[in-house]
Amino acid sequence: MTNNSTPNVLFIMADQMKASILQLYSSEIGIETPSLERLAGEGVRFEHAITPHPLCVPARTSVMTGRYPHSTGCRRNETLMPENEQHAFRIWKENGFTTGLIGKNHCFIESSDLKLFDVRCEISH
């Protein structure tokens, strides 16, 4: 992107981690995460977020599409992102952002979706 007013977007979604263990969220356990704390201080921190689904793939799909699992058909971990579904990474890529996917995916399997990522380093369970 050449426009200096265009923000950098770093989206971090942890799997099976409660915010209540982090010092960042005033936890009694208080696990220190200095890098996350610095990022949160400079960006957006969600204070009242609730997962749309207890399973990881439907929850990720909901966050990426802005739709509930029942509306995308992704209600189980075995049911992945529908082909040609509109989602955040598609929108970012279409608007000139450089995109990357690092870590656990389990959402995007269609080649049309995977091509949206300039950098991809996936891990599994």
Task: Spell out what each predicted region is.
Residues 1-125:
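Formylglycine-dependent sulfatase
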